[in-house]
UniProtKB/Swiss-Prot annotation:
It is found in: Cell inner membrane. Disulfide bonds: none annotated. Pfam families: MFS_1. It comes from Citrobacter koseri (strain ATCC BAA-895 / CDC 4225-83 / SGSC4696). This is Sialic acid transporter NanT.
């Protein structure tokens, strides 16, 4: 960038079409967040009406994560083949219909299935919206694009909490899900009023359709085997999270089966770059394991252990959600300043100072608890706003939506496991201690995985001939691509 360009405020580097693209995707992500967190807000009410155990109730949160890997794969491939815009609209319609079905659910099984539909739509929205905005903005602003976009999910959670305090005490929990149908109107507007992402148009204009992940897996020579493996993975996940299996050994075997299937899909679709894809799934898995016990079970903790009424719960969740939203935006600035990986590590380290006090002070002072949650979520959860940018940089444009969608949403199974882990540990400890200890310990795993750039490092160890040296989104070097003490003369002298 020239000196004169650097002196221009960052927001003036964006034209009206780029701002419109961002605004549309951000609103879509807000609605996604609104619909997705509704179940966490009314979990105790649903549990009471359906007569569920705590673990069964937590599995309703997990259900949306179980289907996400397939939604990310299918809708991501749609985005790679037909454009990011169509995938985004389809995703919004899917999760809206699933939310409406939750409102009519007569029992546990029906609601579980509706949550599976929500998960598919949410996965598609994540992959398509993230790639859409990132590919529409200039390269030097793409951490901001990612962080600002993901803040919409947290804002949606804040809005949902406020609507919960107004609607549920008067009309009951089902009314909250009926409101979730409104995003369909927005989806129809999107289809007619937003342009396609610039990177995608440049890559595909006048060219034959790309061979997507769906083509490789379900139209290639191994299509029959892959269909059978897809059914096997879906069945195994169903039994793990909804089958009420009491035998830990069986659950472990089913989990291992799913891992083998997902790695097989990654090897087939990514070729020699499969080590990068597998490591990205592991990064996301632990990112969800450290963050989602709090995201999913904080409302339950506030209502049961702290005995807060709906109005006070909404107050505290406002601080939490608003902190995460602010953190996404702050993370965007940090990422463009320090580099994506360095910003991630610094923010998570700072968040560790706050996680224990959040669950140690009790509920006597709502304002102190709210402020602690605000800053903890700003630093710990908000930095995940640049995770799409981090993941997307490992994939080329023609595979980015499916690559991001699949790796992220397979890893997001950590979000399915997280609330159940929290609920199980809470059977021996109090819920607050369970949530705090899980988050504190697992955050360090994410710090190591991202700080050491393990996707590039493992790629270098296993298949060095396919090693990518630079981020495909912003061109910055991958620190894990060169051994410690190795020759880094090939790197561009820029922040990493």
């Amino acid at each position: 960038m020239s000196t004169s360009t650097q002196n221009i405020p960052w927001y003036r580097h964006l034209n009206r079409a780029q701002w419109r693209a961002f605004s549309a995707a951000w609103l879509g992500y807000l609605l996604d967040g609104f619909d997705f967190v509704l179940i966490a807000l009314v979990l105790t009410e649903v549990q009471g009406e359906f007569g569920l155990t705590t673990v069964q109730a937590a599995s309703l949160i997990s259900a949306a994560f179980i289907s996400r890997w397939f939604g990310g794969l299918m809708l991501g491939a749609m985005g790679d083949r037909y454009g990011r815009r169509l995938a985004m609209v389809t995703s919004i319609i899917l999760f809206s219909m699933g939310t409406l079905a939750c409102g009519f659910a007569p029992g546990y099984t029906t609601m579980f299935i509706a949550r599976l539909v929500i998960g598919m739509g949410m996965a598609g929205e994540y992959g398509s919206s993230a790639t859409y905005v990132i590919e529409s903005w200039p390269k030097h602003l793409r951490n901001k694009a990612s962080g600002f976009l993901i803040s919409g999910f947290s804002v949606g959670a804040v809005v949902a909490a406020q609507v919960y305090s107004l609607v549920v005490p008067v009309w009951g929990w089902r009314a909250l899900f009926f409101i979730g149908i409104l995003p369909i109107i927005f989806a129809l507007w999107l289809r007619k009023n937003i342009p396609e992402a610039e990177d995608w148009k440049e890559k595909h204009e006048g060219k034959a359709p790309v061979r997507t992940m769906v083509d490789i897996l379900y139209r290639g020579e191994h299509r029959v085997v892959n269909v059978l493996m897809t059914i096997a993975a879906a069945t195994a996940l169903w039994f793990c999270f909804a089958g009420d299996l009491q035998n830990a050994a069986i659950v472990a075997v089913l989990g291992l089966l799913c891992a083998v299937i997902f790695i097989s899909f990654m090897v087939q679709s990514s070729g020699k770059r499969w080590p990068t894809g597998v490591m990205l799934m592991i990064v996301v898995l632990f990112a969800f394991l450290y963050s989602w016990p709090i995201q999913a079970l904080l409302p339950t903790y506030l209502k049961t252990e702290l005995a807060y009424d709906p109005h006070t719960v909404a107050q505290v969740l406002f601080f939490s959600g608003f902190g995460a939203a602010v953190g996404c935006c702050v993370g965007g600035f940090l990422g463009d300043w320090l580099g994506t990986r360095k910003a991630y590590v610094c923010s998570l380290l700072a968040s560790q100072v706050l996680i224990i006090p959040v669950f140690a002070i009790g509920g006597a002072n709502v304002w102190v608890l709210g402020l602690l949650l605000f800053f903890q979520q700003m630093l710990g959860q908000g930095i995940s706003g640049i995770l799409p940018k981090l993941i997307g940089g490992y994939f080329d444009t023609d595979q980015r939506a499916a690559g991001l969608g699949f790796t992220y949403n397979v890893g997001a199974l950590g979000g399915a496991l997280a609330p159940i882990l929290g609920a199980l540990i809470a059977q021996r400890l109090d819920l607050g201690t369970a949530l705090g200890s899980l988050s504190f310990s697992l955050t360090f795993v994410v710090i190591l995985l991202i700080g050491l750039d393990m996707p590039s490092r493992v790629q270098r160890w296993l298949r060095p001939e396919a090693l990518r040296m630079h981020d495909a989104i912003d061109g910055k070097p991958f620190s894990g691509a060169v051994p410690f003490g190795g020759d880094k003369s090939a790197f561009v002298k820029t922040k990493s």
